[in-house]
């Protein structure tokens, strides 16, 4: 009952932001990936690439692996999986990598697409959005592109990407983090709500709570049962200058939906939640800011 009330309340908050108002700034569709860090040999990380395709052969991935120079721990490297990998690589910098190397350095896996572009709009629209039950034609409500491939993507990450990465470097599968921004943040919440044991830490920056009128909020029902006997950590970020939706207005109390979700999730046994508002940041700016904040944290610990 509580979850139903939460979904209804958040739906009203999201609906208030939909009509009119200033649109959310969209990323430049022609912006190219910043690859400068990948070629450098003076850093404590070395980057390589692994290519694979979706099961249906329609999407073509390039995984950028950032491996620390130091030897792995006995159990393998902790792993940070980064969605929108082409953009994530561009958000990394020298100081972040050097700081990581001074501690329990994780293996970085940026899940990108084989394109020179920073963002693969069609790929992420399909891969990062949950299926809508009862709809024969799954189309994204914002851009009209095919959507609904989230579970196929998460299955591929588990059954295809993870073994491919493990063939290149030893992984500690008990210390995995999944990070995503915007639609990627939506996928992170979907992964937490539907398969909470597959990662130890879930990190969602500016998740698209508005998507399909807040459909992701309905997936939260039953999380306590799915999480029983397990533990998970959720990190959430949101910029104070973000509207509530792509067509929303800053006057529509844009942080209300996130605040209510945070309040609800704090009550879930076994889930550790940390919400950090990012003062003054807009939607696009939270991508790099959240990733750097995530990587400034110690690697996720093994469950005891």
UniProtKB/Swiss-Prot annotation:
Catalytic activity field: Fe(III)-enterobactin + 3 H2O + H(+) = Fe(III)-[N-(2,3-dihydroxybenzoyl)-L-serine] + 2 N-(2,3-dihydroxybenzoyl)-L-serine; Fe(III)-enterobactin + H2O = Fe(III)-[N-(2,3-dihydroxybenzoyl)-L-serine]3 + H(+); Fe(III)-[N-(2,3-dihydroxybenzoyl)-L-serine]3 + H2O + H(+) = Fe(III)-[N-(2,3-dihydroxybenzoyl)-L-serine]2 + N-(2,3-dihydroxybenzoyl)-L-serine; Fe(III)-[N-(2,3-dihydroxybenzoyl)-L-serine]2 + H2O + H(+) = Fe(III)-[N-(2,3-dihydroxybenzoyl)-L-serine] + N-(2,3-dihydroxybenzoyl)-L-serine
Keyword Repeat listed: no
Principal location listed in the UniProt entry: periplasm
Residues spanning the signal sequence: 1-25
Key words, A-Z: Hydrolase, Periplasm, Serine esterase, Signal
GO molecular function: carboxylic ester hydrolase activity; hydrolase activity, acting on ester bonds
Residue numbers annotated as active site: 182, 242, 283
Compartments it resides in: Periplasm
A Pfam family hit: Esterase
UniProt induction comment: Expression is induced by the presence of enterobactin in bacterial environment.
EC number: 3.1.1.108
Record family assignment: Belongs to the esterase D family.
Protein name: Iron(III) enterobactin esterase
Encoding gene, per UniProt annotation: pfeE
């Amino acid at each position: 009952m509580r979850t139903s009330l939460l979904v209804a309340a958040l739906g009203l908050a999201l609906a208030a932001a939909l009509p009119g108002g200033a649109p959310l700034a969209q990323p430049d569709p022609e912006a190219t990936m910043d690859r400068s860090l990948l070629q450098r040999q003076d850093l404590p990380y070395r980057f390589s690439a692994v290519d694979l395709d979706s099961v249906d052969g329609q999407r073509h991935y390039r995984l950028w692996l950032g491996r620390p120079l130091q030897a792995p721990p006995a159990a393998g490297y902790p792993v940070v999986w980064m969605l929108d990998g082409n953009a994530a690589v561009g958000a990394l910098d020298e100081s972040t990598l050097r700081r990581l190397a001074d501690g329990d350095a994780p293996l970085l896996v940026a899940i990108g697409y084989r394109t020179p572009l920073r963002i693969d709009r069609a790929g992420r629209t399909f891969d990062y959005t949950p299926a809508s039950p009862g709809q024969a034609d799954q189309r994204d409500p914002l851009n009209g592109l095919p959507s609904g491939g989230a579970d196929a993507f998460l299955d591929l990450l588990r059954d295809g990407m993870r073994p491919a990465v493990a063939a290149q470097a030893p992984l500690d599968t008990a210390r995995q983090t999944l990070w995503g921004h915007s639609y990627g943040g939506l996928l992170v919440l979907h992964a937490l709500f539907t398969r909470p044991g597959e990662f130890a830490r879930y990190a969602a920056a500016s998740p698209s709570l508005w998507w399909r009128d807040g459909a992701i909020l309905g997936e939260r029902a039953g999380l306590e049962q799915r999480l029983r006997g397990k533990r998970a950590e959720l990190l959430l970020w949101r910029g104070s200058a973000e509207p509530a939706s792509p067509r929303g207005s800053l006057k529509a109390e844009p942080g209300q939906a996130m605040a209510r979700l945070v309040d609800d999730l704090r009550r879930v046994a076994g889930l550790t939640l940390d919400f950090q508002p990012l003062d003054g940041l807009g939607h696009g700016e939270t991508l790099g800011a959240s990733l750097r904040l995530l990587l400034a944290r110690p690697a996720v610990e093994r469950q005891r």
